[in-house]
């Protein structure tokens, strides 16, 4: 998400971008994740994160997605789920929507219950849940403590074998939300005309 928008600072000639589950500035990623790990302490740490990024990345550290939006005439599609627990929706989508909701260059797709890593998947395809439920039963059937350090290698091999023997690759590979991807294609096709 962040990268495809930030690149507009350097390549304003890009015709269209689709930003998924992203954030406005690089430090937002640390802040969003840090809130769940450190609570409000993250706000005291954020200035140090920004200084570190400035030393490490120089001028690039201060770039934002919104700077990129202002630097281009590209069409922008922003997609995020309200329940994203990796990057909070307030770090990107909400800010962008507030500023650009009336700008015809922008298209917004907001989901309520797709999280971060499942945003592209069809919510009606339950195969992942089915596979995980069976996997959990398999875990319970093991005759050893798979979390113990001495069983780490054994578990790695057993897990790989279980997955190879039980994963239905056809069902797994058809989890994408095809209607969403048709929207993506339509968006790009319209933008490049």
Set out the residue ranges of the language-model regions:
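Catalytic active-site module of serine/aspartate enzymes centered on a nucleophile-bearing elbow/loop
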Residues: 123-193
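Short glycine-rich catalytic loops that host catalytic nucleophiles or stabilize transition states
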Residues: 109-114
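Catalytic nucleophile loop
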Residues: 1-2
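Active-site nucleophile elbow and catalytic-triad environment of alpha/beta-hydrolase enzymes
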Residues: 52-68, 74
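Acidic catalytic loop of the alpha/beta-hydrolase fold
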Residues: 82-87, 116-118
């Amino acid at each position: 998400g962040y990268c495809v928008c930030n690149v507009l600072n350097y390549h304003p000639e890009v015709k269209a971008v689709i930003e998924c589950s992203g954030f406005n500035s690089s430090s937002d990623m640390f802040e969003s994740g840090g809130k769940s790990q450190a609570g409000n302490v993250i706000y005291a740490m954020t200035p140090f994160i920004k200084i570190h990024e400035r030393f490490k990345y120089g001028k690039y550290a201060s770039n934002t997605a919104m700077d990129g939006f202002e630097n281009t005439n590209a069409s922008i599609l922003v997609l995020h789920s309200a329940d994203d627990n990796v990057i909070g929706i307030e770090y990107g989508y909400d800010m962008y929507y507030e500023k650009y909701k009336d700008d015809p260059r922008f298209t917004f797709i907001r989901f309520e219950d797709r999280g971060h890593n499942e945003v592209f998947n069809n919510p009606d395809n339950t195969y992942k849940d089915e596979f995980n439920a069976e996997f959990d039963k398999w875990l319970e059937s093991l005759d050893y403590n798979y979390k113990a350090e001495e069983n780490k290698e054994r578990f790695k091999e057993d897990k790989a074998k279980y997955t190879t023997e039980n994963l239905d690759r056809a069902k797994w590979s058809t989890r994408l939300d095809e209607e969403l991807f048709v929207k993506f294609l339509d968006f790009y096709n319209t933008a490049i005309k």
